[in-house]
Amino acid sequence: MSRILLGASASAALHKACDLASKLAQQDHHVRAVLTPRAAELVSPQLFEALTGEPARTDEFDEAERSGGMDHISLSQWAELVVVAPATADLVGRLAHGLGGDLLTTAILAVPQSVPRLLCPAMNPHMLATPSVARNLAQLVEDGWRLVEPGEGHMACGVEGKGRLAEPPQIIEAVRRALHLED
């Protein structure tokens, strides 16, 4: 099946990224997770490795030393699809403005434009409604990203509203559409 680069940023919804990685691997996709440094403080990259059977990464320079190369370039050339779930407001802003300060953002920036990209935001409803976040999301869509809309409901921060990470089955359906897979 396909080679999927799964980017994950620090969010209370990070547990869903683990479930998503597992489900994609069970469908015979090759899933390599790249976590932001803050996400790696919440969930161990080794968990993603156990769920997918593929290496998971967090730090470009540590990995580059071990592999003898530029990890962000090898990841970008490997990927047939990029999925970012969860995408926090911070990560959305960095991607919208082309800022590459960690392995995840540098790898994504180096992915060829022909590779489909899915963005799955997860954040507090007030953050999602902020004009700057809305502009950043609109910019990414204009740049060719496909948005998997966040759901509504009770948030980890205690409020109700739109901002929950889409459920793994919804994201998997978006993956199928992006890869043009038929049942």
Task: Please annotate each region the language model reported.
Residues 1-119, 124-183:
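A cross-family phosphate/adenosyl-ligand binding-site feature
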